[in-house]
Each structure stands twice: as structure tokens, then as C-alpha cells.
Curated annotation (Swiss-Prot):
Reactions that this protein is recorded to catalyse: D-mannonate = 2-dehydro-3-deoxy-D-gluconate + H2O
Cofactor(s) the protein needs: Fe(2+); Mn(2+)
Biological or metabolic pathway of the protein: Carbohydrate metabolism; pentose and glucuronate interconversion
Name the UniProt record assigns to this protein: Mannonate dehydratase
Keywords: Iron, Lyase, Manganese
Primary role: Catalyzes the dehydration of D-mannonate.
Domain of life of the source: Bacteria
EC numbers: 4.2.1.8
GO molecular function: ferrous iron binding; manganese ion binding; mannonate dehydratase activity
Gene Ontology BP terms: D-glucuronate catabolic process
InterPro entries: Man_deHydtase, Xyl_isomerase-like_sf
Amino acid sequence: MNLSFRWYGADDAVKLQYIRQIPSIKSIVTAIYDVPVGEKWSIEAILKLKNEVESYGLNFDVIESVPVHEDIKLGLKTRDKYIENYKENIRNLSKAGVKVICYNFMPIFDWTRTQVDKVLDDGSTTLVYYKNQLKKMDPLTGELSLPGWDSSYTKDQLSSLFEKYQNVDQEVLWSNLEYFLKQIIPVAEECDVKMAIHPDDPPYNIFGLPRIITNEQNLDRFLKIVDSKYNGLTFCTGSLGCASFNDVVKMVDKYSSQGRIHFMHVRNVKLLFDGSFEESAHYSPCGSLDIVEIMKVLHKNKFDGYIRPDHGRMIWGETGRPGYGLYDRALGAMYITGIWETLEKISKEDK
């Protein structure tokens, strides 16, 4: 297990020197954030970022994310240009020592929540997805903006994108994903870079847009499109676990035993009666997922990929990027570390 931590670059209130102080953190998960989606990342910019990360004694080997341009997801004639740029990004990142690239194939929006500052009983604030709030949301007119969303779109551009997706159902999106994978995975193989798709969050259609990386059946279908270890998963326990139809422990066991999980996002969620959910502390009793069992199957299957604590609450008066404060994610990192250390020692005692 290689424990890592997400960092949003120079503008992140969470500084590298703070992350360095979390015991057992080895790698930084980051990206180039000032280049428009679909354009090339220069080797100079990549090496500058690498040098900054490594100056704090941390590794630069996981990128999250290299975003996929909407023209690729839509299957437009212009997609080949953006796919060629994507290939070049894989090549340049490999030259800098990157081993895993996380990405997603969600139309227009990344992860979606209906509120980013829900106050919990203990006074902390968290991200929530309430279905009654979603009914009142209009992404074309509302003001909600989330860290995963591309904020560069104007309202007119968003409206135009929604119109283009009118003719894209799940099967069309599958076809466009297949086209993309068959282009980029051979490059990833040549460069020894493992591609790791992130599940859709939440794992069902939203705002009338199709979503396909959502459940075990669809993950099986995805992995068979290009049956290569370089075509793998970012397994996000919260993204898949926020839907009751997903057996997260079973799925982690299955895909880690196949060697197809390259990156784990570990967080907990509390499922509500109507299918809504709240993000919780990582500690298993705080939510609906059994983090200990998840870590046990990873350990059993000798998982040696990357793992990071995912979204955290805002605690101890911290403010900043929703879900990405320092304190609660640091607690999550140490919870994960403690479980893993215990499993390691028990395993050695049993031999």
C-alpha cells in the first residue's frame, strides 16, 4: 500500500509542508490546473510541479486528473485532436516518473453534491446529497459550484453542452468510451503508465445526463473493452458506496484480486432512507461502509497500489475547499494506516 494525499497546487490552502507532517504519507496526488481541458501539458510545467513536490520529500507518481474533453465523450469529429493531446500528456507524464493517471468519463460534471456545508450533530460540516434538494437544483441557473466541476463554462456554454448531450444515451457514451480507450491504452502500455478510471459520483444518471461507470456489471464491461492491466480502476468507496445496490467489500475483493485496482479512494458515507447520503468521518461506525473490511480484503489480496483518504469533513474551525481540508483527511490517513499496520502485524504473527 502506498499512502498518498490530494493537493490542488499552489492555490491550495493545505500546504505541502503540512502534508509532509502526516506520518506514512509517501506520495502527492495532483495535476496541472492552469491548462484548459484537452490541451497539452508541457514537460516543463510537469517537471516544475514534480520538483516542487519532491522538494518536500514526497513522491510525484500519481496524477488526478487528466480531464477528458467533452468532445471525446460526445464523440464529435474534433475528438481525435484531443485524444492525440491526451496521448502526449501520458507520454510527458511518464517521462516525469508518473505511474498512475486517474480520470473520469462523466458528462459535463464531476462529483455532485447538493450542499457543501451541512452542519452535523458534532458541529463539523460536510458534503451531502439530498434528493429533495436536487429536485430544486438547475445547473444552468444555480450558483452551486463544486471542486470537481469545470468552472470555466459560461451559462451559454453549459446550455449548449446540454443540448449536445440530448442525443447521447448510455450506449452512445459506452461507444465513445470504447473509442477513447482503444486509442490511449496502447500508449499507456508503451509508457508503463496505468490508467485508472474513477466511478461516476453519484453512480446514476443526473440532470438528465448518462452515467455508466456505476456498478459491478458496468465495471466488468469496462475492463473487458481493453483487457489489459493498464486499463484499470480508481476504486472510490464513497462514489460506489453511496448507492445501496453496490456491495463495496465484494467489489474491492474482486477487482483487487484481479490486479485491476491501481488507485483507492477511501472514505465513508452515511446512506439515508430515501437514497440520499451524507459524507461522514472515515471511522466505520460513523457511516454505512465497513472500512476495516475494505482494508482487510485489500491486504488479503496484497494490494500494492496507491491509496488516499478521500473527502473529509471540515473540523476544528478549518475552512477551505469543500471536502479537501487538512485535518479530517489527516485523521482518515491515520485511520487507514492504523488498520493496515494491525493487519500486517497479525499476518506476521500467523505465519
